[in-house]
């Protein structure tokens, strides 16, 4: 199953060993970033580093080596631009980098196999999800220390905070519920059941009672009115009212939706449905499916720019393009042959996409207006994802 791939640590030529001591970012000595919005961050799993590429020049301005056998999964910059963080899936540690100096300033033990993460809006709290540990590690960014481990989850993936920072919502890929965390107490206070497994489960036990493809993320709408959580096994999107923390509507989408992605104008959202190779376009005003369109296999992400949606089909080598005004297909972009596309970020001007391509260790830059592609090679070994501060399309597998 492709979703198993999404949750599997990428293989590669990794050196055995423990995480190196502080100072492993020595190759970045003397490099300074005065404007945190000026760079694309690239997480390289097999070279165990975070690379920084200047958006204007497309030149590497620095790399921070994290240590041997780290296998970083996702990279994110704090909202205040002060720090860059990542979780080392094989190291069971969180790594904190000073943005201005590109120095690794702290390594903090987490629970098992840290992957996805998020910052509170005020940059105070760094929540690190640990899918194999069924927990969230809470890191205080003032003291740069782990202050708590929140237990009780089921393969937690993505974390989203309310704009006021009062609550965090945790997608549980191994269950059909979204966890609600009281950020003041750092406690799991509620489980929002997206839907019940239907009574026909006994008739199709492989689908309903086998490996669960649950909730990847509870994604807020741009206006913050609702949260949307796609359940892969059940093929639905649950609409959550955060004022009451309950599901107010179910939207039937395609088979095995991976997650939901929000358009920037607040009109539509998209679920890539890997079970039937379609996308569902959801009208956020009516909370209903406005269109179901053919797509590609093994979709890993959706980005929005220039009135279009760009849907990444990981193993086909294509990015599928859709006109978000007419809600119709607008072609596809061939990125290469026998390549593996990962995930992308969109620049803050919504002009270009920066797509990680792991086979040839490069970043592919897509011009959103013309669909032209530019390649930047030698970014690191097995680039897994990209991140730009303040982008509306920062996500991971």
Regions found by a protein language model. Give the residues of each.
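Predominantly soluble domains enriched in secretory-pathway, periplasmic, or organellar proteins
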Residues: 7, 12-397
């Amino acid at each position: 199953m492709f979703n198993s791939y999404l949750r599997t640590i990428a293989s590669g030529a990794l050196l055995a060993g423990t995480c190196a001591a502080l100072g492993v970012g020595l190759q970045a000595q003397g490099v300074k970033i005065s404007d945190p919005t000026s760079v694309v961050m690239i997480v390289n799993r097999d070279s165990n580093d975070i690379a920084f590429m200047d958006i204007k020049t497309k030149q590497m301005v620095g790399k921070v080596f994290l240590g041997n056998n780290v296998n970083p999964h996702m990279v994110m910059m704090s909202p205040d631009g002060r720090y860059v963080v990542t979780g080392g899936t094989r190291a069971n540690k969180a790594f904190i980098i000073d943005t201005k100096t590109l120095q690794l300033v702290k390594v903090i033990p987490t629970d098992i196999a840290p992957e996805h993460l998020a910052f509170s809006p005020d940059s105070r709290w760094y929540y690190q999800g640990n899918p194999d540990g069924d927990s969230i590690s809470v890191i205080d960014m003032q003291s740069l220390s782990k202050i708590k481990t929140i237990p009780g989850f089921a393969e937690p993936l993505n974390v989203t905070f309310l704009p006021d920072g009062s609550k965090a919502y945790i997608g549980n890929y191994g269950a059909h519920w979204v966890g609600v965390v009281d950020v003041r107490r750092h406690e799991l206070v509620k489980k929002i059941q997206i839907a019940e497994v239907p009574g026909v489960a006994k008739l199709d036990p492989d689908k309903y009672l086998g490996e669960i493809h649950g909730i990847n993320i509870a994604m807020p709408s741009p206006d913050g009115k609702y949260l949307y959580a796609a359940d892969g096994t059940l093929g639905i999107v649950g609409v959550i009212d955060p004022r009451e923390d309950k599901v107010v509507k179910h939207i039937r989408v395609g088979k095995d939706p991976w997650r939901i992605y929000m358009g920037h104008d607040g009109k539509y959202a998209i679920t890539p449905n890997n079970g039937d190779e379609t996308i569902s376009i959801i009208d956020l005003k009516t909370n209903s499916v406005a269109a179901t369109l053919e797509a590609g296999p093994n979709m890993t992400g959706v980005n929005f720019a220039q009135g279009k949606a760009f849907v990444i089909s990981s193993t086909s080598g294509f990015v599928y393009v859709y006109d978000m005004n007419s809600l119709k297909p607008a072609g596809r972009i061939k990125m290469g042959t026998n390549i593996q596309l990962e995930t992308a970020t969109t620049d803050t001007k919504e002009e270009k996409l920066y797509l990680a391509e792991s086979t040839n260790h490069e970043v592919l830059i897509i011009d959103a207006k013309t669909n032209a592609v530019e390649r930047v090679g030698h970014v690191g070994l097995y680039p897994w994802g990209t991140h730009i501060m303040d982008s509306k399309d920062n996500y991971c597998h």
